[in-house]
């Protein structure tokens, strides 16, 4: 659950060369405003495609953020500084994009909820979890404005009008944002390449935050499954089985700690084949995957809880990833002619979907 304490929206109009910086925060008592901001922040906070980073010692923004967190700078003033920086940088891009800038200070109470789940039998731990404030986060989001059309009926007038200031829907993905944990300094961000004077730049991590860039949860899980599939094919194992086991290991690790260690996943899958495990670890190192990557339970469920396969005959099967580790439910066997037989067993009921 998110609790937004402050939020503000600034407008950039690159066509006219005009910027409109708000002088007051958004009214979060207004139901629609609060709903939009919360849903937008929830979308980016839980995005598995967010890359992770840490501030460089020379980061200018890190110092300013620390001053704000300590109360030395007011929220509106700090948001103006951020907006001015983005205004100057974005207008230098070869292809300018109309956008608004959302800045927010909010609390993510999911950490407290996780503590409650992990200590369900410990009354003191539960009390601590509910009393805790969760993670205090600071978000900077570029909201692309899109052209839309509205129907206007006014007396004898009946027109279709163009609206150039339409914000993206709360559930729509946005390409450019940063979320910083004000307690730990940990950064989640997403950005796309922009051409500035003919040179490609990721302005959020490289120029604004000045931070490192580690693979996202989605990227790490994808790399792990690719490595497992390649090794399964190389050593004559069934790729569908081994990849589903890898996904099950990811889901299980996220359920317990909300962190996935690629090396531990390999040890879990190839514990009886040390020669494959050694190759797996070498490939993890060569691809420079992080030792650990944060993966929330909900994200793991979406990405790894189920595994889907499709045969060359057009049959598609989706099944729980952990089913291949449970004998007597789903079996893959190779025939002498190279064909594969898939057996689904112990089924008591079939439902059309």
Predicted features, each with a name:
Residues 264-353:
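C-terminal structured domains
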Residues 1-301, 305:
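Long, hydrophobic alpha/beta structural blocks
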């Amino acid at each position: 659950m998110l609790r937004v304490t402050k939020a503000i929206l600034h407008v950039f109009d690159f066509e006219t060369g005009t910027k409109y910086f708000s002088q007051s925060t958004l009214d979060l008592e207004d139901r629609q405003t609060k709903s939009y901001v919360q849903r937008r922040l929830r979308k980016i906070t839980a995005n598995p495609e967010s890359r992770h980073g840490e501030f460089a010692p020379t980061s200018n923004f890190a110092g300013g953020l620390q001053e704000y967190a300590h109360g030395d700078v007011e929220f509106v003033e700090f948001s103006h500084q951020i907006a001015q920086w983005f205004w100057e940088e974005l207008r230098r891009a070869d292809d300018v994009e109309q956008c608004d800038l959302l800045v927010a200070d909010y609390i993510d109470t999911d950490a407290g909820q996780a503590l409650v789940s992990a200590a369900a039998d410990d009354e003191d731990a539960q009390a601590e979890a509910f009393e805790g404030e969760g993670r205090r986060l600071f978000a900077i989001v570029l909201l692309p404005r899109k052209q839309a059309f509205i129907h206007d009926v006014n007396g004898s007038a009946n027109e279709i009008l163009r609206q150039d200031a339409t914000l993206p829907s709360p559930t729509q993905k946005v390409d450019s944002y940063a979320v910083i944990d004000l307690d730990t300094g940990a950064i989640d961000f997403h950005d796309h390449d922009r051409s500035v004077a003919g040179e490609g730049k990721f302005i959020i991590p490289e120029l604004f935050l000045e931070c490192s860039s580690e693979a996202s949860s989605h990227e790490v899980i994808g790399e792990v499954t690719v490595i497992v599939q390649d090794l399964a094919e190389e050593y004559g194992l069934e790729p569908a089985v081994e990849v589903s086991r890898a996904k099950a290991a990811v889901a299980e690790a996220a359920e317990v700690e909300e962190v996935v260690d690629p090396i531990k996943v390999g040890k879990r899958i190839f514990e009886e084949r040390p020669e494959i495990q050694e190759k797996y670890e070498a490939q993890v190192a060569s691809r420079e995957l992080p030792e650990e990557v944060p993966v929330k339970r909900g994200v793991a469920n979406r990405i790894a809880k189920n595994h889907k396969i499709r045969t060359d005959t057009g049959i598609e099967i989706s099944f729980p990833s952990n089913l291949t580790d449970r004998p007597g439910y789903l079996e893959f066997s190779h025939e002498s002619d190279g064909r594969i037989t898939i057996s689904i067993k112990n089924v008591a009921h079939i439902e059309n979907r």
